[in-house]
Amino acid sequence: MTQLNTPVARVSDPGHRPTPPPSVPRRRRPIRGTRRAFWLFVGPFFTGLLIFSIIALFWGFYLSFTRAVATISPTEFVWFDNYVSLLTDPSFLSSLLSFTVFAILVVPTTLLVSLVLAMLVANLPVARAFFRSVFFLPTAFSYVIASLIWKLGIFSGSPSSVANTVLSSVGLPPIDAWLTQSPYYWVVIVTVRLWLQVGFYMLLFIAGLQRIPDTLYEAAAIDGLSRGPRRFFAITWPQLRPTTAAVLLLLLVAAFQAFDEFYNLVRTIPSARPPLLYIYNLSFQQLDYGKGSAGAFVVTAVVVLVALLQSRFFGFGAADEAKKPRRGARKERAS
């Protein structure tokens, strides 16, 4: 008899499943037109940025070293004469003093009020989203509209205005010079700026409060540190240091950019003009574009200097640096 060489099928375990062969990942082909679509969306933005920001920045820097009166085409290269004339102009120095007073009044007030509101809203048992929306809503208002409301309705100087009605209700005489005399116009300017921007910085502090681990408060409660000022200064305030530094920097930059409320409320008072209003009058009323460009770069240099000093003394990322182990500690752990 002859044996047929037929393959014998292997009997496999019924519970065993054969392993499928490894699948080779397929390369995804790039979608056609992706690069073209990218430039179609981003191209107009970069074109506007190049024309209205970058080229304008370099052209303004060039104008600051030239004499350009009633024309943007320079007629004479004067080197640093515009800067010297600007820094020796009493009106410009008075505008820097106005900014200093405004910053001293509005920056700490906004910081304190926004921090207090953030802690109150963050600790509410209910309706947190509602109160966040209520306090944030004024940031959507225009500075021009808010200034007109303050000027025509709240601090108009008439006996029927809101401010004078409140003063009369508590037995105080009404004030007619809200918008013409110091320190009354500072009350008007600071309150309108406070109403417009405190909600935004409140949200920043709420975000900082939400980043604080609950374990820190639990450990403090175990150690006997109850709610109150001691726990705030021991735990909350150090953890909010990076957020506070960012808020301070944003407030200082916003104070330097103050223009709308001053222009609509006290533009006729020379002693209440901030640097931007002085540069506006210099460039668009006196038509001295060379000196106006020099003023813009002087203000920019002051903003950068103040920001560097603020970050140097208060510090960004101080909490992150504190969390990093020192080199000596690393060596001890390694040994």
Named regions from a protein language model:
Residues 1-25, 325-335:
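Short, intrinsically disordered terminal tails adjacent to the first/last structured region
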Residues 5-8, 21, 28, 39, ...:
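Low-complexity, intrinsically disordered short peptide segments enriched in small/polar/basic residues
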Residues 34-327, 332-335:
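A structural signal for multi-pass alpha-helical bundles of membrane permease subunits
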Residues 26-30, 34:
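Cytosolic juxtamembrane amphipathic/interface segments immediately preceding
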